[in-house]
Design a protein with these regions (language model features):
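Acetyl-CoA-dependent GNAT
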Residues: 4-62, 67, 86, 118, ...
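A short, internal acetyl-CoA/4′-phosphopantetheine-binding micro-motif in the GNAT/acyltransferase core
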Residues: 64-71, 100
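Conserved acetyl-CoA-binding loop-helix of GNAT-fold acetyltransferases
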Residues: 72-85, 110-111
Length: 136
């Protein structure tokens, strides 16, 4: 698998799979190198990961998407570890992510060393678990 920064040519692929972000923000994140594209050996897109900054100073992984037929084969773990290394190289010591309490992703992140750091209660959604990881 290959991990690269998303470009304008990846816009439709991302837009068609990410209902949680506005179309204009996708373009902004592409230009800011805040979306990674996962590609298979044929150079076909198989997934993506996007991030931002919590409090504008702590890298926060917003979402990982892996196309159905490529799931459970290590692509998610690979992109998380890649992102962690990128953030470490940029000088960050702490990173964050979150997942809903009714999703299995919480176990995935804990296996990768993320620790529960709190939660967010929203009116219409399950509890959102905040997770952090120290990169030192």
């Amino acid at each position: 698998m290959k991990i690269v920064f998303a470009t304008d040519s990846d816009y439709e692929y991302i837009r068609n799979r990410d209902p949680h972000i506005s179309e204009s923000l996708i373009l902004s994140k592409i230009k800011g190198n805040e979306i990674y594209i996962l590609r298979n050996q044929d150079e076909s897109n198989i997934g993506w990961m996007r991030y931002g900054y919590f409090w504008d100073n702590t890298p926060f992984m917003n979402m990982i998407w892996v196309d159905e037929q490529y799931r459970d084969k290590g692509a998610g773990k690979q992109v998380v570890l890649f992102w962690e290394e990128q953030m470490k190289q940029k000088g960050f010591n702490l990173i964050m992510t979150s997942t809903q309490a009714d999703e299995g992703a919480q176990h995935f992140y804990r296996k990768l060393g993320y620790k529960d750091a709190g939660c967010l209660i929203l009116d219409t959604q399950p509890l959102e678990i905040l997770l952090t990881k120290n990169l030192n």
